[in-house]
Amino acid sequence: MQVISFFSAKGGTGKSTFNMLLASYLKYVLGKRVMVLDLDAPGYNLSSTREREADGMLQENPSFDANSLYPIRKIEDLTRSHIKVEIADLRNLEEDYDYVVIDCPGSLVQTDASFQMLAAGVFTLIVIPMDIDGMGIASSYSLGEVCKSLGQPFLLFFNKVYWQEKKELYAQFESFFADGGMRVSSHRVKNSVKLRRDADGTAAYMRSSVCFPMKEIKATVPEIIELFEEVLAYAGRRDTG
């Protein structure tokens, strides 16, 4: 079983969107057994999206089977003692799931659930989305340093990329991270308003926990699929190596 999380200690990087899309890609495209743990208090974005989508599906089709969806567990008790219980329970799920995707709170201090899970070695891979600004670069580098100190495998990638920005600038930052022993994916995800919209009954969405909108993704941000394939291949190597 592989445990993956798109995670950033800086808000607004799109981590929850990528966690949702990865889980949907694994379940609805690859046919994998997937569970999502939602620890992202107080908003619990993934849980609220699932509730809204499931209600909509039932209204459209009363015979809809919610068991056909991957489960999203909302973890409301984020105390240190309970997170220890969650970590122990997680290690007992290997027979039931191929992947567990965890959406963590967007902060990293030693009292956080995120840090506790990192320190416990829960994750097969941490994937760090980053913006090309000073604060985003600094935050991502600091998180990479924490992962390195804990022996946690991780992969960085650029999100919200504007193609008119100079490619040389991205290359410079990639070299900066490489000098620090940090791997940056070559798959840069371009900026898209649609990527920030939940399913709303129209074609103008990319975020969904009840399907993977392959047509819309391929038409707008096909690099997401390439990124996911890289993430899964890298996690697979770490899991077996």
What feature does the model see in each segment?
Residues 102-103, 126-131, 156-160:
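Conserved beta-strand segments of the P-loop GTPase G domain that flank and frequently precede/overlap
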Residues 7-13, 20-22, 27-102, 106-112:
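P-loop/Walker-type NTP enzyme "switch/lid" segment
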Residues 111-134:
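Inter-motif core of Ras-like GTPase G domains
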Residues 32-34, 100, 126, 153-154, ...:
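Hydrophobic anchor at the start of a short beta-strand
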Residues 162-213:
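Beta-strand-loop-alpha "switch" segments that mediate conformational coupling across diverse proteins
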Residues 205-241:
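NTP-binding/hydrolysis catalytic cores, primarily Walker-type P-loop NTPases
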Residues 137-151, 156:
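Conserved C-terminal guanine-recognition region of P-loop GTPase G domains, centered on the G4
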Residues 1-7:
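Extreme N-terminal, non-catalytic leader segments
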